[in-house]
Amino acid sequence: MVYVYEFEVYKGEKFLLADPYDMLGGTQGVDFKEVCEMAGDWLKMEVEHCLMHDLPMPEATFGNKPKHADGQNIIVVVQLEKENIPRYTFAEAARQLGVTRGRVSQMVDACLLETFELDGRKWVTKYSVDARLAERPKAGRPRKKK
């Protein structure tokens, strides 16, 4: 499905900022090209979140008047289906993380990994596995502070 939203781009203190008119949040970039690319990435992540959790996307509005004196509007378009969200089975996530499938289930229960359902099957998002790999917590219990 295609998702189209209007963003306002304006100058912040150090970066150009892009805020969507119909959602909370936003993004930034060092120049106009980068802020447009970041707005596309931001919208993609928002749509993925809504698709994974069966949340409705807000109604898009167009022809909005910029809120900032130097603001200009851009249109951001993403094409995305729930089937295209990067994901792993629990077994694949376990292999990536170097743990057992049971440990992956524990990490999901502890909200350390994000999951979603697709066609009656539960999947682990690649983003949450990548984030966990980037953290690389050490094995065992944390040491007690003296």
Feature locations, PLM:
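N-terminal segment of the canonical double-stranded RNA-binding domain
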Residues: 1-14, 19, 41
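Short, charged, surface-exposed hinge/linker loops at domain edges
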Residues: 1-4, 38-109, 114-121, 145-146
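A short, exposed loop/beta-hairpin motif centered on an aromatic-Gly-Thr core
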Residues: 22-34
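Short amphipathic alpha-helices within nucleic acid-binding modules
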Residues: 33-38, 130, 134
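Short helix-start
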Residues: 113-138
